[in-house]
Structure formats: structure tokens, C-alpha cells
Amino acid sequence: MKDYEKIKEFVNEKDNAITVNDFKDAKIKFYYINKLMEDNYIYKVRKGLYVKINSFEDEYFTIQSRYKKAIFSYNTALFFLNQTEVTPNMIDITIPNEYNVSTIDRERIRIHYTSRENIELGAIELKSPFGNNVKTYNLERTICDIVKNENKCGLDLEQKNKVIRNAFSNKEIDKSMIIEYAKRLKCEKKIRMIMEVFIW
């Protein structure tokens, strides 16, 4: 089956997770999707999401596939941005205030809320540890979130100070962007006080 061999090549070229839209875009019929499952080439994680056999499920990709407006934040953002050496025990996501996530696993996922106007503020796309594209906040937004909501960030005082100190010693960080974000997030005063301690 020449076509089937090409389809398997298509699957091999994809990252660990494959969505039903990936198959549709490639004009692959459901007959072949079912055959891939029968042949133990892929398995169905949930409706519309498949993972290649012998690969680990990408929990980060699965979360964002299920909750489209969720953006990784706080400790999880620090992890994606290589600002921490420890893989967080909890996954932090930020969602719009009105977004319904009643079915989410709250023992594994810590939920933070923001306004609909600010949900995309500082959002960027990076690769998960499994090679899939996921959305997370940049370092500037993450620092603002941690400073504004220090009691909800999952960091103790020593960890928080270390993160902030390392962030402001990073030459690539945009300090003017932090101020701009702080104004939008209503934490400008706290951010300026922090910057006075760690920069000047």
C-alpha cells in the first residue's frame, strides 16, 4: 500500500502529538487513521488528539489542545524559559476570568486568572519538552505576574528573589516592556520598587 506507507512517513515527520486537523490538512481519510491505530502506530488520547506509539504523551500540548485559551505562566513559564533548573510539580496556567475549566485536574494544574484584555499580553510560542508548539508568557510578563501575585506564584521568598535577580541580570530582558506590562496589569508601583532594588 504505497499511500499507506506515505501516510506513515507523514506521521513519523510530525512531533509526538498529532491532531485531527493535521490529518485533515494532509487530506488523510479516517479509514487510514483507524488503520494506524489498528496497526499500533498511533493511539487516541482523546477526541481529535493522537500520539505516536512508543512516545510519551505531551501533557503540556494536551492541556492547551483541550483548553484553547490557557497560557502557561508562573513556574511553568519559568521552566519553558530556562529560568529554573527544576521541573515544577504543578503546571501553572492563566486563563480569562470567564473561561470555564470545571473539568480540569486541579491537583495537577494551578489556575490563575486575568482579564480578557490581558490574556494575550506577553504570550509567545515555544517548543514543549516533547517538541510540540505551546503558548507561554515571556519573561517580562512572568516577572510582572510573580511580583503582582507573590502569594499565589508557588515560590517562597528566597526562590522569588533568585528568579527576579536572575531575570534582571539577563541582558536580553526588556525593562521598558516590563514597565509597559506593569501598567496594564496594575502593578507598576511594585515593579518599580523591585527594579530599584535589583537594578539601581
List the predicted regions and their residue ranges.
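Short amphipathic alpha-helical interaction segments
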Residues: 25-38
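Short acidic, hydrophobic short linear motifs in intrinsically disordered regions
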Residues: 14-26
